[in-house]
């Protein structure tokens, strides 16, 4: 008797499955369409044998280009390692590698644009075309405006840390390629306040992503909705059918081991093609300020990303000095 397909196999028929990791071996094993890299993952890569040659090469570059401006050298090595890891990952996946712009640029439109262009140029030097890369940017007003310009230049963007409808709609209106609403972090906020949902259908993160997905489809938006930051397979299963789902290796493994039925939960609705009303900076700020959860989680998310980047830079500094 033929075994029934795993839930991971069934999910792949409903949504594009993305690996929320830069773990080379996990990506080889789990075969996602897309994957990601960020400072935390690059820092972990410093200890993985598969990246040893890349790391030694870039550290040697850093030692040779030390000069007087040590911080600039450290930052450049961090960029080179990020793109180097991304280049290796691009050879494993048929789709895209998301590459994160420095979180400390989250409120600087022009600096975000400059860093994105730099990453794309660095990838090109390594033989990776821009259609293999998504530039990951925090969904502040300034980040969304940077993405608007980058999209016009043909550089596709992944706007991350989406917690609020105005963030999502502003991204769609700006023509952003993809948004990443954070399911688990939304749930975390309410659970911390003693508001644990009675069922998965009442999970505030699941409800939010379903709402954004339905509105985008109804309005005919081409912006891809990629659910992110999952705390359980139940959250993932509740969003089966979403455009894309980015999932950690441990949850991918659990889905792969489960051979139960996985029904579709999200489907494109009949579009009424009602245009998304442009959102200006004032209404965006007002909406965000009125949403305690989004305000807290966007700020803490940026802060966490910035601390991760600083930890990577410190590790590089230590290795350059060693």
Curated annotation (Swiss-Prot):
UniProt keywords, alphabetically: Cytoplasm, Pentose shunt, Schiff base, Transferase
GO molecular function: transaldolase activity
Gene3D superfamilies from the UniProt entry: Aldolase class I
Reactions listed under catalytic activity: D-sedoheptulose 7-phosphate + D-glyceraldehyde 3-phosphate = D-erythrose 4-phosphate + beta-D-fructose 6-phosphate
EC supergroup of this enzyme: transferase
Subcellular locations according to the entry: Cytoplasm
Pathway: Carbohydrate degradation; pentose phosphate pathway; D-glyceraldehyde 3-phosphate and beta-D-fructose 6-phosphate from D-ribose 5-phosphate and D-xylulose 5-phosphate (non-oxidative stage): step 2/3
One biological process term in Gene Ontology: carbohydrate metabolic process
Chief localization: cytoplasm
GO CC annotation terms, alphabetical: cytosol
Its EC number(s): 2.2.1.2
InterPro entries: Aldolase_TIM, TAL/FSA, Transaldolase_1, Transaldolase_AS
Active-site residues annotated for this sequence: 136
Chain's role: Transaldolase is important for the balance of metabolites in the pentose-phosphate pathway.
Protein family (similarity comment): Belongs to the transaldolase family. Type 1 subfamily.
HAMAP family: Transaldolase_1 (MF_00492)
Subunit structure: Homodimer.
Name of the protein described by the UniProt record: Transaldolase
């Amino acid at each position: 008797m033929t075994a029934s397909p795993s839930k991971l196999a069934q999910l792949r028929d409903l949504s594009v499955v993305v690996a929320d990791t830069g773990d080379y071996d996990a990506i080889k094993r789990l075969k996602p369409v897309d994957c990601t890299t960020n400072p935390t993952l690059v820092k972990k890569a410093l200890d993985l044998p598969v990246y040893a040659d890349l790391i030694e090469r870039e550290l040697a570059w850093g030692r040779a280009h030390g000069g007087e401006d040590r911080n600039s050298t450290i930052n450049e090595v961090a960029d080179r390692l990020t793109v180097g890891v991304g280049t290796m990952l691009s050879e494993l996946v048929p789709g895209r590698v998301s590459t994160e712009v420095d979180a400390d640029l989250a409120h600087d439109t022009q600096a975000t644009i400059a860093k994105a262009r730099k990453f794309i140029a660095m990838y090109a030097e390594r033989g990776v075309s821009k259609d293999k890369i998504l530039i990951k940017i925090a969904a502040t007003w300034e980040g969304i405006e940077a993405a608007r310009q980058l999209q016009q230049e043909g550089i596709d963007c992944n706007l991350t840390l989406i917690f609020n409808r105005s963030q999502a709609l502003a991204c769609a209106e700006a023509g952003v390629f993809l948004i990443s609403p954070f399911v688990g972090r939304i749930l975390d906020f309410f659970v911390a306040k003693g508001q644990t949902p009675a069922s998965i259908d009442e999970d505030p993160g699941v409800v939010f992503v379903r709402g954004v997905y339905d509105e985008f489809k109804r309005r005919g938006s081409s912006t891809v909705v990629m659910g992110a930051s999952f705390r359980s397979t139940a959250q993932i299963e509740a969003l089966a059918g979403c455009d894309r789902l980015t999932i950690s290796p441990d949850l991918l493994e659990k889905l792969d081991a489960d051979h139960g039925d996985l029904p579709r939960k999200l489907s494109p609705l009949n579009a009424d093609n009602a245009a998304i009303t442009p959102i200006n900076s004032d209404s965006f700020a007002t909406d965000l300020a009125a949403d305690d959860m989004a305000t807290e989680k966007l700020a803490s998310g940026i802060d966490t990303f910035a601390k991760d980047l600083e930890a990577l830079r410190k590790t590089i500094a230590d290795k350059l000095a060693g």
